[in-house]
Regions:
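Active-site beta->alpha loop and helix N-cap motifs at the rims of alpha/beta catalytic domains
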Residues: 2-100
Length: 100
């Protein structure tokens, strides 16, 4: 988590199925498209619909992206909650997932 990040990081959307649930397979497709274009990713931010995701979904989105990238490109995840305490708590969880 302390490495220097270079290059383009695309703020990707979070994918959902027809029922409104997070769709990890479609998310992996999004990630692969960006990797193939030579980009790293920023997941779970404004384009990633962070404001409609619960904590489990935020972790699932980040886990899916980190897993799919598998060290081939940088991945940065949004971390922002209503309270500072919750932001710090979630940030610690997200940091353990392998984001850059």
């Amino acid at each position: 988590m302390n490495k220097k990040i270079n290059g383009v990081l695309t703020a990707i959307v979070t994918t959902f199925d027809r029922e409104g649930a997070f769709d990890p397979m479609k998310q992996r497709e999004q990630v692969r498209r960006q990797i193939n274009a030579g980009n790293g990713i920023f997941c779970g931010g404004t384009n990633g619909e962070f404001f409609v995701l619960n904590e489990q979904e935020k972790i699932a989105v980040t886990t899916t992206c980190v897993d799919e990238i598998n060290g081939r490109a940088p991945v940065v995840a949004h971390n922002g909650e209503i309270s500072t305490r919750e932001t710090i708590r979630l940030g610690k969880q997200i940091a353990r997932l392998g984001v850059d």
